[in-house]
Amino acid sequence: MKKTTIIMMGVAIIVVLGTELGWW
């Protein structure tokens, strides 16, 4: 996998977790 792909996936996961925690 390319570094950019891993970074994009990491950012997406952080955003999802951030919104999930934000609702709680």
Curated annotation (Swiss-Prot):
GO cellular component, one term: plasma membrane
Record's note on what induces expression: Constitutively expressed, induced by thiol oxidant diamide, slightly at 45 degrees and slightly at pH 5.5 Celsius (at protein level).
Source species, domain of life: Bacteria
UniProt membrane topology term: Single-pass membrane protein
Alphabetically ordered keywords of this record: Cell inner membrane, Cell membrane, Membrane, Stress response, Transmembrane, Transmembrane helix
All ranges on the Cytoplasmic side of the membrane: 1-3
Ranges that cross the membrane: 4-24
Subcellular location: Cell inner membrane
Main location: membrane
Record protein name field: Uncharacterized protein YoaJ
Organism from which the protein derives: Escherichia coli (strain K12)
Lineage: Bacteria, Pseudomonadati, Pseudomonadota, Gammaproteobacteria, Enterobacterales
